Amino acid sequence: MIFDKDDFKAYDADLWNAIAKEEERQQNNIELIASENVVSKAVMAAQGSILTNKYAEGYPGRRYYGGTDVVDVVETLAIERAKEIFGAKFANVQPHSGSQANCAAYMSLIEPGDTVMGMDLASGGHLTHGAPVSFSGQTYNFVSYSVDPETELLDFDAILKQAQEVKPKLIVAGASAYSQIIDFSKFREIADAVGAKLMVDMAHIAGLVAAGLHPSPVPYAHITTTTTHKTLRGPRGGLILTNDEELAKKINSAIFPGIQGGPLEHVVAAKAVSFKEVLDPAFKEYAANVIKNSKAMADVFLQDPDFRIISGGTENHLFLVDVTKVVENGKVAQNLLDEVNITLNKNSIPYESLSPFKTSGIRIGAAAITARGFGEEESRKVAELIIKTLKNSENEAVLEEVRSAVKELTDAFLLYED
């Protein structure tokens, strides 16, 4: 270590104390935010390495600065591992985030003002899939598709009909709050039928795709984007994949010099470490357990008539619950659960009647608790504790019982072993 913990604590006690408090919070809370996970110590070590000192504009073998031989090795490791994981011919590991990966993908496929179809935010889409407050909605003419109002599932006949009407240049598939399997082959059929390109944002399900537990979009999408955290269990960052050499060139130019300068090679190194972990057979077991734990929690809610799971269940790492029969809205539920050390987020549901700042639902994810070692029994217990909290929100004695139960679970499954 160049700068050890004792040096850090002595030099900047205020910052040290803040980080220590966050470590304590993560250890003592049950983390159910679907976009969060727990990285390995190896990932943290790589991200905190001396590579943070090095500027490296460009790409391996084509840098604008000298002294890049070593970071070329680092970045090439990340690229080759990403290609191996997803069976892609080309990979760009430099995006600082999933949103920037999406921005670069758009720049590679379409022009400002072009018509694009993306999933409606309330149906499970992401801000960068055309929300008016996002650069995507402000730069391109996005037309949203929604899930079926009855089944709350993707309706490919309706999406095809809509695509034939609006004639998009690009269709964006993928979601941040959709709990069922997505058939990317059908999206490609629709795109081909109307002469559009297909882009898939698999940020939430990338770890499941990597483990072979969700169909891969890579054979069907012209460009696939993802984050490297969430179910991939890596550092916070982005990744872009394609099988098209000409698109790969456009992607590289869109990232640098298009929207980014020097890559964060310490983060690229952390991505490389996490990709090595994904290639380990143990990762497939982890991903399978994520789905099992998600289903175990969902099953508890399905047995309670006061709660409704959107689309009737889950086939991945997350699910949405309509809580409005029990509490006023999703924000109230989120705040109540914060008080008992269970962390999740309020979330809009399809055809939402409340504002995004209140919402009718909550989103529950299993990636982080699975990384800590929770199994199906513990996952069912977590769901029971959520229900107990929301149904007894004014009973302090019951809430204290929940806090004690949460403490038992977090003490039994440490965030990190010493």
UniProtKB/Swiss-Prot annotation:
Question: Keyword annotations for this protein?
Answer: Amino-acid biosynthesis, Cytoplasm, One-carbon metabolism, Pyridoxal phosphate, Transferase
Q: Which InterPro entries match?
A: PyrdxlP-dep_Trfase, PyrdxlP-dep_Trfase_major, PyrdxlP-dep_Trfase_small, Ser_HO-MeTrfase, Ser_HO-MeTrfase-like, Ser_HO-MeTrfase_PLP_BS, SHMT-like_dom
Reactions listed under catalytic activity: (6R)-5,10-methylene-5,6,7,8-tetrahydrofolate + glycine + H2O = (6S)-5,6,7,8-tetrahydrofolate + L-serine
Q: Where in the cell is it found?
A: Cytoplasm
Copy the pathway line from the protein's UniProt record: One-carbon metabolism; tetrahydrofolate interconversion; Amino-acid biosynthesis; glycine biosynthesis; glycine from L-serine: step 1/1
Listed GO CC annotations: cytosol
Q: Which cofactor does it need?
A: pyridoxal 5'-phosphate
| Keyword Repressor in annotation | no
Please report a single Pfam family linked to this protein. SHMT
Give the EC number(s) listed in the UniProt record.
Answer: 2.1.2.1
- Which positions does the site annotation Plays an important role in substrate specificity cover? 229
Q: Which GO terms describe its molecular function?
A: glycine hydroxymethyltransferase activity; pyridoxal phosphate binding
Ligand binding ((6S)-5,6,7,8-tetrahydrofolate)? 121, 125-127, 246, 355-357
Q: Which residues carry this modification: N6-(pyridoxal phosphate)lysine?
A: 230
Q: What does this protein do?
A: Catalyzes the reversible interconversion of serine and glycine with tetrahydrofolate (THF) serving as the one-carbon carrier. This reaction serves as the major source of one-carbon groups required for the biosynthesis of purines, thymidylate, methionine, and other important biomolecules. Also exhibits THF-independent aldolase activity toward beta-hydroxyamino acids, producing glycine and aldehydes, via a retro-aldol mechanism.
> What family, per the record?
Belongs to the SHMT family.
Q: Summarize the subunit comment.
A: Homodimer.
Name listed for the protein in its UniProt record? Serine hydroxymethyltransferase
Organism name = Streptococcus pneumoniae (strain CGSP14)
